[in-house]
Amino acid sequence: MPYLSGLGNDLVRIQRFRRFLEAGKTAILERLFTEEERSFCLAKKDPAPHFAVRFAAKEAFLKALGTGLRYGIRWQDMAVVRNPEGKPDLVLDGEAARLFEDRGHVRLLLSCSHDGDYAFATVVFEGN
C-alpha cells in the first residue's frame, strides 16, 4: 500500500525572476532551467510567473527529498513540463532521478500556482 514518503513546499516572489529578465541575466536562467522550460516560459507574454513557479517546484522537490543540491543534483535534473491535459508534471533526470528511486520513492505529485506577487509549489512523494 502506498504511503506518504516525502513532502516539500516553496514560495517564490515573482519579482525576483522579473528582475533577472529585465537585467538580461540569461546565464542564471540557463543554469536553473532546461531548454524546454526556457522556451515555454519565454513564449509567454509575461514569462516571470512561469519561471518563478518552476523554480518553486524544483525547490519543493529538493525539500521533499531532503538533500538540497547535494550529491551531484543539478537544477536541470528537474523539469516542469505539461502533460497532454495541460497539468504540470515534474520530470526527473540524472542524480535527482537516481536519488528519488534509491530512497524508495515511487511516485511524485506536483501542485503549483502563481497569483499576484507569488508563485507556490507543493511536491508529495509516495513510497511502497
UniProtKB/Swiss-Prot annotation:
Its EC number is 2.7.8.7. GO terms for molecular function: holo-[acyl-carrier-protein] synthase activity; magnesium ion binding. It is found in: Cytoplasm. Its cofactor is Mg(2+). It holds the Pfam family ACPS. Gene3D superfamilies: 4'-phosphopantetheinyl transferase domain (3.90.470.20). Mg(2+) binds at residues 10, 59. GO terms for cellular component: cytoplasm. GO terms for biological process: fatty acid biosynthetic process. It catalyses: apo-[ACP] + CoA = holo-[ACP] + adenosine 3',5'-bisphosphate + H(+). Keywords: Cytoplasm, Fatty acid biosynthesis, Fatty acid metabolism, Lipid biosynthesis, Lipid metabolism, Magnesium, Metal-binding, Transferase. InterPro entries: 4-PPantetheinyl_Trfase_dom, 4-PPantetheinyl_Trfase_dom_sf, ACPS, Ppantetheine-prot_Trfase_dom. It is an enzyme of class 2 (transferase). It comes from the Bacteria. Transfers the 4'-phosphopantetheine moiety from coenzyme A to a Ser of acyl-carrier-protein. Belongs to the P-Pant transferase superfamily. AcpS family. HAMAP family: AcpS (MF_00101). This is Holo-[acyl-carrier-protein] synthase. The lineage of its organism: Bacteria, Pseudomonadati, Thermodesulfobacteriota, Desulfuromonadia, Desulfuromonadales.
